[in-house]
């Protein structure tokens, strides 16, 4: 974790731009191209921890300002650590397996993480 802060279980993470190649961080960029996966547990700053890069989860933290329906592609959101319904031009890294339509960043949904792809 190279974010300078803790990463929470369910946070969406990206590759950190460092030469070591083994660092992750959080982003506030919608549809970030360096999206990598989701933290499987809380990870303290400057520590290592498990990251889910593909497969099923019940832990993905999401924002529902743009309604999420089952089957929607998900990408990074403008609030660090959260995913959102991906838009055209975004990098998607997950498929929603649960709807979330509340206009907040309190959602935790089932999702299938996939190899990132530009939509």
Language model regions located:
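Extracellular receptor-binding modules and their adjoining Ser/Thr/Gly/Asp/Asn-rich linkers
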Residues: 1-119
């Amino acid at each position: 974790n190279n974010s300078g802060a803790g990463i929470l279980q369910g946070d969406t993470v990206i590759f950190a731009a460092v030469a070591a190649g083994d660092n992750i961080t959080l982003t506030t960029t919608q549809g970030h191209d360096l999206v990598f996966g989701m933290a499987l547990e809380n990870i303290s700053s400057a520590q290592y921890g498990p990251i889910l890069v593909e497969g099923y989860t019940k832990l993905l933290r999401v924002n529902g300002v743009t309604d999420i329906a089952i089957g929607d592609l998900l990408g990074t959101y403008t609030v660090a650590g959260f995913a959102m319904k991906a838009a055209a031009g975004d990098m998607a890294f997950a498929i929603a397996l649960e709807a979330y339509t509340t206009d907040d960043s309190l959602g935790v949904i089932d999702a299938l993480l996939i190899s990132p792809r530009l939509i």
